Structures are given as structure tokens and as C-alpha cells.
Design a protein with these regions (language model features):
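Alpha-helical transmembrane segments of polytopic membrane proteins
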Residues: 28-39, 338, 418-425, 483-488
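Low-complexity, intrinsically disordered, cysteine-poor segments enriched in small/polar
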Residues: 188-191, 195, 199-202, 373, ...
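Hydrophobic alpha-helical transmembrane segments in multi-pass membrane proteins
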Residues: 3, 226-414, 481-530
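Hydrophobic alpha-helical segments
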Residues: 1-22, 302, 420, 434-468
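Non-globular, low-confidence helical/coil segments that flank catalytic cores
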Residues: 98, 108-110, 115-122, 133-142, ...
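Hydrophobic alpha-helical segments of membrane proteins
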Residues: 207, 211, 223, 289, ...
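N-terminal leader/targeting segments
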Residues: 1-84, 291, 484, 499, ...
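Membrane-interface helix/helix-cap signal primarily in integral membrane proteins
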Residues: 67-238, 580, 630, 645-648
């Protein structure tokens, strides 16, 4: 079988992704099981009947891969992930271990990972993310003893690395550093990474050094939020996330130097392998880098033995390496994008390049004379540009479905921006590597300065390009609407249909026309149908209220409380559609309404923060909290916020209580916080369509409404259920799910 590992690897990726992202749905398991059994039956029949033994063997291998990967995901989830979650989640633990990676710091917080060896006195190998809003008196790879209240970790990128728990420094956390350090190969790599970062910080201004650190080492936490937004809006975030592209550039540069020194293919293979492993370690063994590293090592080994490695087979083998023993690796969306982009480049870049060159009747024979030489090199440059374009287009088309589904947005200008930025990124990678390494070498550190200068100039060019293009209208398009998925589905079906058509030239033209028509018609209908959209979303956050008002062009938070364990889910849900928040309103500083504020501040750009509190001292302390300016007020206040053209939020502050009356075209919602007395609320606000509460307010009999929305835990809901039923016969709770209210549609 020519591409055994290709078949197994891609099957692993497909099955594991289907199981994980369907949240272990029973229907998905039924489909996968049926597919495996059917493949086995057909494969055995073909082998026995000798009609097509080769295809029969492929079907049997496919069936094995389907069954193994599904079973592997079930076993890993049940005996690895769930064991840790069931034993330690939402409990206070006492544990020992060591900080197993670098401590990541930002302006307002720091986080680090502890790998435990004992929990509650019992041997236990678990990884726990610790989040702190103050400095931690410990060093990377230092042994520690600690006490913490742990929560389930729901961040997919961390689940992919086996980090199933998290804890917060201020939530009963105590840590005692022993001073003893653990020495491993990875700890040595982290030391080199820290030294390289210090070199870049010493050589370059902050804006440029942080970009170099992001591009070279994948550390984008230090980047300014506006810079990250610019990269996100232009769809070029992959440039500041260490990936296979970065590894290829670095390794190609090293090989260029090595080949100048030796022609021995075994030495070249050794240098290649060393460079790949070193770069993987320094960048934290990111899945996309490991994918590229495995492929590169295979190609190098094949070359040393005078063989040509099959690209798809190599890619499949890399998938097997990454997922065979860690099926949760598919939780890293970056890894899936890496595999998808690479597959697109392998399958489509050459055909696209040939088609473009054929369209321009490209022929490039060198002719004598100056003019002939100039024309030759111009045509050669044109071919290089076509090659770069074909690679970018093929990668973009293959990651488009994943990007649209995972991030709910795409950038139409990503190909143009990436083509303009990639030459600068390549130069930046090489020069920042050289200057960061040379600067820490005694006696020759002065050689780092010219490379630092080039790195700074490249950083300036990249930042200018990305910032300029991010300001263009339609630099990014939201794809959370149904028409996008219809368009993707139609396009995929048209592409599959092309495999069975003889006259492909005519079919391609018709397919492109149909695809564009579906997209344009869908977008037009979406604009007409959603122009007046406005909804209120109340999240399942346990004890407290976190509610947003979402409009087509803006998002506002009317309360941001709840259990800290739900912070990641809430911020991730909002960030799928919005990068900034127009208004954040804190009804009072009780944790039930404010505990998740710091998470929102860290994740989003906040245009207006309004805090109601009569305590003058607390008001004065707020602005020093994280540098964000807040409008604080107390007393009896009354004002209206225009959240959109069709939705308003009327704020009524009476007797130390903030009421909020949210009004859409057809629906009104009254938000009443704890300890409120409804007799203080003006009578005209006592007849909302929906009442949002987290406890039963005083004088609730004064309210007349159609529906009561209770935000709180299941225990609280059951405790207050009969009292709530007296307000309205229709009662819904966030204890099991998020609740959405259509403010303009009823």
C-alpha cells in the first residue's frame, strides 16, 4: 500500500475531530461505528472475491484506523481526562510538584503550569494551570508545595497538552517554593528561550522586540492588544504563532549554511534533525511545529538514503505521531489548521501554479543580450510570485471551512496581506534568531547589532502593513450566519462533483459562478434579515449573573458576575463574534455581578465601563485596578444608554440599588439585583415582558411579567422555585444552559 500512513493519519484526524467537537455525541459514534463495520465487511468481501484486493486492503486499514481512533478517544477521555476531573475538580487539594514551563506574564496577570507528583498525599501525575494577578515567588522548574481550589479547565488548546485543571491565586491558593529545581532537556530549552527573549528586549524597542518574540518564539502575550487585533482583523494571526512555516524558514537557512561547509548527506541530515528538535523544544513543542518537524526529519532521512519521501504519507505519519497516544491533540485548532493548510498546499498548489502559467502562456528561455537577460529574470520573478500566490491560495481555501466554523470570521484580504508580509517575516525570523543568539555569546555579541537593526526595520514594515490593511472596510467578515455554511457545503459538493466530470474546463467555470452566486445572494439576504437584530444572552455561570446585549455591530455587558470557572467559556463565546465591548455595566461590586470583570478586561477592548457604588474609597481604587478608565457613580441616578439603533438600556438607581430596563422593538427585560425592593422602582417599569433575577426580590407581587429568567445554580433554583412561580407561571433557569432573548423579534 503506497500511502499507508497517509490513510491511517488522516482517518485518525477525521474521526478524533468528529468525536471531540461533537462533544462525544451518540449519533456521531453510531455513524463512525457503522462506517467502520461497513468498511471491514466490504474490504473482506473484495479480498476474498479477488475483485479488487488492493482497495479491499485499504478499506480494512481504514476500518482499523476508524475503530482504533474512536476507541482511543473514549479510553483517553474516560481513564485519563475524567479520572483527573472526577477526583480533583471543584475541590480543595494539597499537592506537590514543579513548575514545568515558563511563567507567562502580562500587564495584569501571570500564569504557569504545575506538574504534580502527589495530590492529597497520593501519587498523581496531573497538570494544573495557575492564574495569578500578582507576582509569584517561584521560578520555572522549581519544586513547589501548594494548596488550591481547582476547577475543570475548558480551554481546548490547554486540553490538547493534558492540562485538565486550573486554579486561581486569590481563591485560597497557597504556594511554598522549595528552592530545588528539576533539570530536564526541556528546562534547558526554556533557559535558552528566556535568554533569547532578554537579548531581543535589550536590542530592540518594546514594540519591535515583542513582535520578534511572537514571530520567533511564539510568545504573543506581550503584544499590545491593538497589534493582536490588527493581525486578527487581517487574518494573519498565523504569522505571530509559531508554525511549520517558521520551522521551514529557520531550517532552510541553517541548511543553506551547512551545505556551504559540507556535502556529506549524513552530516546534513544530522544538522537538520538537531535544528528541528532544538527549535521544537525552544518553542514549547507546539503541535503545528512538531507536525512540520516530523515531516522534515522524514524528508531529510529519505534524502540521506537517496530516496524521495511521499508528502501525503509524511503528513499522515505526523498525524499518527501526534494523536496515537494523545487523541486530545485535535483540541488544538492550530494543529488542525496546520494539517489542513499543508494538505491544500500538497494537493492544489502545483495545479493552481500550472493553470496560471498556462493562462499567461508562460515560457522562459534565456536569450542573448542585455534585454534578453532582463526579460528572463523578470519572467523568473513572475514565476516565483505565482508560486507564492498558489501556495497562499491553496492553503487559504483548505483552511476556510475550519476558520469559518471555529472563529466565525474570515478575512478576504488575508492572501494579499500575507504575500506582502511573508518576505519581511522570513527576514525577521532569520535576523532575530541570529541577533538573539549572538548577543548572548561572549566576545562576538557586537555582531548582533546589525541583525537587530534589520529585525527592527522588518518589524516596522510588518506592523505598518498589518495596521494599514486592518483599517480597510470589510477587512474581516463574520461567518456565524447560516448562509456561510450553506456556501461552504455547496462549494465542497461542487468540488467533489468535479472528480466525476469529463469536461472539467467548462465545469470549473460553472462551479465558480454557482459558488459566487450562492455567496452573494446569501450575504444580501443576511443583511436584509439581520439589520435590526438584537438579543440578550444570559450565561450559565453558577452563582451570579453574566448577561450581554448583542447587536449586529456591538456587544454590551449588563452584568459580569458568576463562578470564575466559567470565565473561559463565556469569554470564548463572546470573542467568536466580537473583539470589543461597547458598554460594561457593574450593577454593584458584589461578586455575583463583578467577579468576571478582570477576565473580560484581559480579553476585550472595553470602550466604556460603568460602575455603580456609593463607597467613595472603592470608586477611587477602581481606576488603579488595571489601568482602564471607569465611570463610577453613586446615589439616585437615572440615564439611558443607546446600545444600538433599536435597543436601549435604561438605568434606574434608587436606594443603593441599580435596576436596568432593557428595551428592544418588541420585548422588554427588567434586571433586578439581589436585595432590591421593588416598591422603590417607578411603576412604569413594573410590567416587563421578562424579569431577570438571581434571588426573589422584596415586594415581588408588584411585578407583572410573562417570563421569569433565573440566573443561578440548580440548587438555588430549586430552593426559590415556588416563590418564583408566584411572579409568573413561566420560569426558565440558566442552571443547565445559556438563555437567549430576542429583543426585536419577540
Amino acid at each position: 500500500m503506497k500511502r499507508l500512513f497517509g490513510l491511517i493519519g488522516f482517518t485518525f484526524l477525521f474521526v478524533l475531530s468528529a468525536v471531540f467537537y461533537s462533544d462525544f455525541n451518540e449519533i456521531v459514534f453510531a455513524i463512525i461505528g457503522s462506517l467502520g463495520l461497513l468498511s471491514v465487511a466490504v474490504g473482506i468481501f473484495l479480498i476474498i472475491s479477488k475483485k479488487n484486493k488492493s482497495f479491499g486492503k485499504s478499506l480494512c486499514v481504514f476500518a482499523f484506523a476508524v475503530i482504533y481512533s474512536a476507541s482511543n478517544m473514549i479510553g483517553y477521555s474516560e481513564y485519563v481526562n475524567n479520572t483527573v476531573i472526577n477526583n480533583y475538580s471543584d475541590k480543595e487539594i494539597t499537592a506537590s510538584g514543579y513548575i514545568c514551563d515558563e511563567i507567562i506574564t502580562t500587564d495584569s496577570s501571570c500564569s504557569f503550569i504545575i506538574k504534580t507528583d502527589k495530590i492529597n498525599g497520593q501519587p498523581s501525575d496531573a497538570k494544573i494551570q495557575i492564574i495569578s494577578y500578582s507576582n509569584v515567588d517561584a521560578e520555572p522548574f522549581e519544586k513547589v508545595n501548594f494548596t488550591a481550589h481547582t476547577y475543570k479547565n475548558n480551554v481546548n488548546s490547554q486540553l490538547s497538552h493534558g492540562i485538565f485543571l486550573k486554579a486561581y491565586f486569590y481563591d485560597g491558593f497557597k504556594i511554598d517554593a522549595t528552592g530545588e529545581k528539576v533539570t530536564t532537556f526541556y528546562s534547558f530549552a526554556v533557559s535558552i528561550r528566556r535568554a533569547m527573549k532578554n537579548s531581543l528586549d535589550m536590542l530592540l524597542p518594546e514594540d519591535y522586540s515583542t513582535l520578534c518574540r511572537a514571530v520567533l518564539l511564539g510568545e504573543k502575550t506581550a503584544l499590545d492588544s491593538s497589534v493582536k487585533d490588527d493581525f486578527s482583523l487581517t487574518g494573519t494571526s498565523f504569522l505571530i504563532v509559531v508554525s511549520g512555516m517558521h520551522l521551514v524558514i529557520i531550517t532552510s537557512f541553517v541548511l543553506f549554511l551547512v551545505r556551504k561547509l559540507t556535502k556529506n548527506r549524513f552530516l546534513i541530515t544530522g544538522f537538520t534533525t538537531f535544528t528541528v528538535i532544538a527549535f521544537m523544544a525552544v518553542t514549547g513543542f507546539a503541535h503545528s511545529v512538531v507536525r512540520a518537524g516530523v515531516m522534515m526529519i522524514i524528508v531529510s532521512l529519505a534524502s540521506s538514503n537517496l530516496r524521495i519521501a511521499d508528502s501525503l504519507n509524511n503528513l499522515g505519519f505526523a498525524a499518527v505521531v501526534l494523536t496515537a497516544f494523545n487523541p486530545y491533540a485535535v483540541a488544538d485548532i492550530g494543529m488542525l489548521l496546520s494539517f489542513s493548510a499543508t494538505t491544500g498546499i500538497i494537493l492544489w498548489s502545483r495545479p493552481i501554479e500550472r493553470s496560471v502559467l498556462r493562462f499567461f502562456h508562460y515560457k522562459n528561455k534565456r536569450k542573448d543580450g542585455f534585454v534578453g537577460t532582463v526579460v528572463y529574470y523578470i519572467k523568473r520573478l513572475f514565476k516565483i510570485c505565482v508560486n507564492m500566490l498558489s501556495v497562499s491560495v491553496s492553503a487559504f481555501l483548505w483552511i476556510l471551512p475550519i476558520t469559518a466554523v471555529a472563529f466565525n470570521r474570515i478575512s478576504p484580504i488575508v492572501i494579499l496581506v500575507s504575500l506582502l508580509c511573508e518576505p519581511f517575516v522570513s527576514a525577521l525570523l532569520v535576523c532575530s534568531l541570529l541577533c538573539s543568539v549572538l548577543y548572548i555569546c561572549p566576545f562576538i555579541s557586537f555582531f548582533a547589532y546589525p541583525f537587530g537593526l534589520v529585525s527592527g526595520l522588518c518589524s516596522k514594515a510588518i506592523l505598518w502593513l498589518v495596521s494599514t490593511f486592518s483599517q480597510l472596510p470589510f477587512s474581516t467578515i463574520k461567518t456565524h450566519s447560516l448562509y456561510w455554511f450553506v456556501w461552504i457545503g455547496v462549494s465542497i459538493l461542487l468540488a467533489i462533483g468535479g472528480l466525476f466530470v469529463i469536461n472539467r474546463k467548462f465545469y470549473v467555470r460553472i462551479s465558480v459562478l454557482i459558488s459566487i452566486s450562492v455567496l452573494v445572494i446569501g450575504a444580501s439576504l443576511n443583511v436584509l434579515l439581520t439589520a435590526d437584530n438584537g438579543e440578550m444572552k444570559i450565561y450559565n455561570v453558577g452563582n451570579g449573573v453574566f448577561a450581554t446585549v448583542n447587536c449586529p455591530d456591538s456587544c454590551s455587558v449588563i452584568s459580569c458576575g458568576g463562578n470564575r470557572a466559567s470565565a473561559d467559556d463565556v469569554t470564548a463565546d463572546i470573542s467568536e463574534s466580537y473583539s470589543d465591548i461597547e458598554y460594561m455595566i457593574i450593577p454593584n461590586q458584589n461578586n455575583k455581578y463583578s467577579s468576571l470583570e478582570r477576565f473580560a478586561v484581559a480579553e476585550f477592548d472595553l470602550n466604556n465601563i460603568l460602575v455603580y457604588d456609593n463607597d467613595i474609597k472603592k470608586q477611587n481604587l477602581l481606576n488603579a485596578f488595571d489601568g482602564n478608565s471607569r465611570q463610577t457613580f453613586g446615589g439616585n441616578s437615572h440615564f439611558t444608554l443607546n446600545l444600538s439603533d433599536t435597543v436601549t438600556d435604561e438605568v434606574i438607581c434608587v436606594d443603593n440599588t441599580m435596576f436596568q430596563f432593557i428595551k428592544g422593538k418588541n420585548v422588554t427585560v427588567l434586571f433586578v439585583p439581589t436585595d432590591a425592593d421593588l416598591s422603590n422602582l417607578p411603576e412604569k417599569y413594573r410590567n416587563p415582558d421578562c424579569l431577570l433575577i438571581d434571588t426573589v426580590p422584596e415586594n415581588f407581587d408588584l411585578i407583572s411579567c410573562n417570563t421569569v429568567i433565573f440566573s443561578g445554580s440548580e440548587k438555588q433554583f430549586k430552593k426559590n422555585y415556588y416563590s418564583i412561580k408566584e411572579i409568573s407561571p413561566t420560569v426558565i433557569s440558566t442552571s443547565e444552559r445559556n438563555i437567549t432573548v430576542n429583543l426585536n423579534g419577540g
